[in-house]
């Protein structure tokens, strides 16, 4: 699905996404450093020195001791966190700018695609569904791209932090990551089918809701004449209730991982403390290791929750993305290659003498029988004519053929 969604993006948009992922990689390095600096900082505060470890190669302060070592350690920590925050702010700005431009360009392209389609396209498609595609589907596609970026970005950061924690304590990190993996897998298995089903239902209910809302606004005169207000209000209420109910359920499901991971972290920390005490480790060492794991958990818990939430959102949004891809007709891909439909370069026709209809026939694509069959007639300039017939006999179709909105299936119109 992501490969097909990728095809909807133009070259510039793809370059922007690659640039954003490069920023995410930089963020991963800075996140890892911000976690890694905690261990030597705790060591300085508790012991007045940096333990001989991997981190000591990066933080060599010579013979500094006491307050000077504390000041230097705090300063380095502050600088790393400041650089990390500025980097994340810049990354956030780039992401929001890209998503805004994507929303604008995609909606504009789809609207132009619709507007430059043949008139018969509008006869074959419900205007409420087209309106839904222009407003709802384009915004959900942007949400799909955003969720994909969050999913991959958080995984990159998660891997970076995991490497740091593995160096600090391989066993403790393994226990934590294994526990997070098990809980994530269980939540995924229990919710994935439900989320996909909710996404499909959302498209159906959203289309019906838009249809009835547009009917009420665009056909208010007919609704009042036919005394259909109560029926239309009932239909809107029914679909609106279903729509808001679907939103409530998906928000509830996507909110569950955060609480699950919080409980998991408390249980895991308690288990680690018992293991360390049982191993007769010094209390200072226990505090030191728990300190870095505690700081890391402030990033791991929301990160794991965002990874799972973004994946759930991706599955929820996928049915809408499939509809949008169908709208752009990626099978033939002619529009996507050109980005814009060619302008009509035909020479304007001047009506000077008469219009001749020769064996004119027309059938709609969804029907086998002809709406008009073998029509031949001549209309001279200046003549006033009237076209009469029963409902459905083809009067409007003939007018649409005369003014060029429809193209004949057989025969021709000569001017």
Predicted region positions:
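Transmembrane helix-loop-helix hairpins at lipid-water interfaces of multipass membrane proteins
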Residues: 21-83, 166-178, 277-287
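Transmembrane helices of ABC transporter permease
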Residues: 23-26, 150-201, 271-286
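Short intracellular "coupling" helices and adjacent cytoplasmic loop segments at the cytosolic face
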Residues: 49, 100, 108-138, 212-235, ...
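Hydrophobic alpha-helical segments in the permease module
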Residues: 77-84, 181-182, 258-261, 265, ...
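Juxtamembrane loop-to-helix connectors within ABC transporter transmembrane domains
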Residues: 95, 115-160, 218, 242-244, ...
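Cytosolic ends of transmembrane helices, especially the final helix of ABC transmembrane type-1 domains
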Residues: 205, 221-228, 252-255, 259, ...
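Primarily ABC-family ATPase nucleotide-binding module
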Residues: 328-386, 414
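Helix-to-loop junction immediately C-terminal to a conserved catalytic motif
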Residues: 403
């Amino acid at each position: 699905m992501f490969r097909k969604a990728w095809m909807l993006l133009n070259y510039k948009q793809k370059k922007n996404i690659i640039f954003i992922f490069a920023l995410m990689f930089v963020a991963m390095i800075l996140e890892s450093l911000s976690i890694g600096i905690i261990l030597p900082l705790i060591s300085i505060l508790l012991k007045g020195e940096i333990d001989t470890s991997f981190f000591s190669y990066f933080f060599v302060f010579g013979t500094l001791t006491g307050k000077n070592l504390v000041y230097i350690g705090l300063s380095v920590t502050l600088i790393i966190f400041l650089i990390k925050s500025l980097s994340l702010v810049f990354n956030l700005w780039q992401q929001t700018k890209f998503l805004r431009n994507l929303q604008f360009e995609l909606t504009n392209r789809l609207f132009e695609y619709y507007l430059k389609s043949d008139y018969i396209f509008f006869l074959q498609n419900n205007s409420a569904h087209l309106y839904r595609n222009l407003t709802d589907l384009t915004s959900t596609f942007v949400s799909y791209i955003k969720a994909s970026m969050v999913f991959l970005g958080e995984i990159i950061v998660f891997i970076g932090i995991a490497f740091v924690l593995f160096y600090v304590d391989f066993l403790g990190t393994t226990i934590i990551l294994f526990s997070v993996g098990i809980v994530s897998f269980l939540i995924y298995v229990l919710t994935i089918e439900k989320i996909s089903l909710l996404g499909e239902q959302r498209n159906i209910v959203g289309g019906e809701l838009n249809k009835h809302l547009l009917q009420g606004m665009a056909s208010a005169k007919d609704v009042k004449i036919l005394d259909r207000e109560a029926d239309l209000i009932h239909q809107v209420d029914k679909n609106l209730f279903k729509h808001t109910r679907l939103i409530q359920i998906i928000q509830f499901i996507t909110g569950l991982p955060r609480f699950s991971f919080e409980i998991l972290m408390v249980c895991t920390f308690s288990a680690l403390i018992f293991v360390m005490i049982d191993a007769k480790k010094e209390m200072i060492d226990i505090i030191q290791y728990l300190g870095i794991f505690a700081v890391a958990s402030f990033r791991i818990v929301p990160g794991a929750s965002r990874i799972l939430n973004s994946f759930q959102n991706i599955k929820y949004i996928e049915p809408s993305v499939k509809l949008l891809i169908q709208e752009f007709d990626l099978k033939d891909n002619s529009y996507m290659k050109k980005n814009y439909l060619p302008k009509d370069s035909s020479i304007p026709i001047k009506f000077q003498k008469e219009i001749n209809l020769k064996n004119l026939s027309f059938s709609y694509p969804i029907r086998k029988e002809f709406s008009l069959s073998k029509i031949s007639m001549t209309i001279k300039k200046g003549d006033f004519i009237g076209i009469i017939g029963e409902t459905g006999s083809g009067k409007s179709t003939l007018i649409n053929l005369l003014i060029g909105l429809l193209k004949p299936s057989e025969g021709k119109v000569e001017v």
